[in-house]
Design a protein with these regions (language model features):
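Positively charged n-region of N-terminal signal peptides that target proteins for export
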Residues: 1-4
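Acidic/histidine-rich, surface-exposed loop or edge segments in extracytoplasmic proteins
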Residues: 29-39, 97-111
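Short, contiguous alpha-helical
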Residues: 44-48, 55, 65-106, 146-201
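Alpha-helical packing segments of well-folded alpha/beta enzyme cores
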Residues: 46, 50-57, 87, 118-132, ...
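Acidic/histidine-rich alpha-helical segments that form the ligand environment
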Residues: 110-146, 153-168
Length: 201
């Protein structure tokens, strides 16, 4: 699992048909099969779920595991979590969000190996992401960002953030499993399943 640099070529989705794409409503024909879809709300729900898993997993790690890495050319646990936090600033900056003063993507992930500080950085970057996306309307998702490509828009940037979060969550789970650490949400599900078994007999 080698270090990945923020992609310069994005897979851009077809979000260029105008605000009507983001807020579908039923028409006079009485077609009620296409309910409205709130892109902002859905992206925030998805990102918040992933954020909770990152924090829960970081808190579940023994402090001395923060410097563990699967190979010399891979990120450590600490670097991976800080990379996640840093990419929130870097990705949302693509659509004009202001990252913290003096923020440097590459340097940021090497700033600390302290577990409490890492969790704090995950929380701060999540609040930044939430505030940025909360400040958008669904129509804003369709706004073009020419510097990213002729059809690229703000919605693409948000979904790059969503995809990136899931990618690194999977990476962090693999790190944990290699070290014999069961993700807390999985452990909780297993516990509930075990408690139900006696009731089923």
């Amino acid at each position: 699992m080698k270090k990945r640099v923020l992609p310069v070529c994005f897979i851009l989705m077809a979000f260029v048909s105008g605000p009507g794409v983001w807020a579908q409503t039923t028409d006079a024909s009485g077609d009620h099969t296409a309910p409205s879809y709130d892109m902002k709300a859905q992206s925030l729900v998805d990102l918040e779920r992933v954020q909770k898993k990152f924090v829960d997993l970081a808190n579940a790690l023994p402090a001395d595991k923060m410097t563990w890495r699967p190979s010399t050319d891979s990120r450590s646990f600490a670097e991976l979590f800080l990379h996640v936090a840093g990419e929130r600033y870097a990705i949302l900056k693509l659509m004009g969000a202001a990252a913290p003063e003096g923020f440097d993507t590459r340097a940021f992930e090497k700033t600390t190996t302290d577990k409490a500080k890492i969790v704090d950085e995950l929380n701060k970057s999540w609040e930044f992401s939430k505030k940025t996306i909360d400040g958008m309307t669904n129509a804003d998702f369709a706004k073009l960002i020419p510097k990213l490509g002729p059809q690229a828009n703000a919605g693409d940037v948000v979904y790059i953030l969503v995809a990136d979060a899931h990618e690194h969550l999977g990476q962090s789970i693999a790190y944990a499993r290699v070290n014999g650490i069961v993700p807390p949400w999985t452990a909780e599900a297993q516990k509930k399943a075990a408690e139900k078994k006696p009731e089923q007999k």
